[in-house]
Amino acid sequence: MREEHVGAVHAAKEKIGEIQAILAGATDAAEEMIGVVVGATGGENCGDPSGRGAFERAARVPDLINDVYATLVETVNELDAYLLGI
């Protein structure tokens, strides 16, 4: 495999790792919001039955999803640039 191919594969693996980390954060935020809703509605106590901070946690999810989208766009653009250079 040519050196530039090795570099491209390495860069792609790094991007995949970034996407996985962002999605893990989005998952954690979503699970936290679900816990607040369950607690606030009389379900099991999920750490914040009062609902305090629910809006702040809910506000994080769109930002995390936007981060995923931006990373995917960046990856696609880099792949396009690489393929055009072959």
Give names to the regions the model predicted:
Residues 1-86:
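N-terminal secretion-targeting helices of virulence/extracellular proteins
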